[in-house]
Amino acid sequence: MEMTVEKTTPILEPMAQLNIGATFKIVPPPDGPARGHLSARDPVTGAKKWEVTYKQPPLASVLATAGNLVFVPDSEGIVHAYNADTGEELWSRNNGMGHNAGIISYMAGGKQYVAVPAGWGSLVADEFVALYGEPFKSMPKNTGALIVFSLRQ
């Protein structure tokens, strides 16, 4: 990513607008296209236990549960559930829209749920179209859904 810091005057009328005081552009790394990965590390030694790679960088947060699961919502719209010890993919679902927000887990009525915000639209989303084309070019922008799954006990 290339970033230029600029002093700008915030736009306040007719309503406040985002002003981060910088412009940025995502550019591919010099050694090839940008990719993403999730790696699990031993917390004591730092040794890599396992790694999963993605065609594009996932933009959403990662969720680890006490039940030994790791959830990763990827940029293409697929939610992956992995075994935290081995990295084996246990489950996945295509939500039809990219993910770029936080995933959470909660308990209600004695049952555990995972809630995944889905939708495509942000400063970064526009840059993904320029870098990767499809499927991001065809994704509806500024849409959203909250998709909730229950976990088996």
Description of each model-found segment:
Residues 5-59, 63-153:
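Extracytoplasmic/lumenal domain signature
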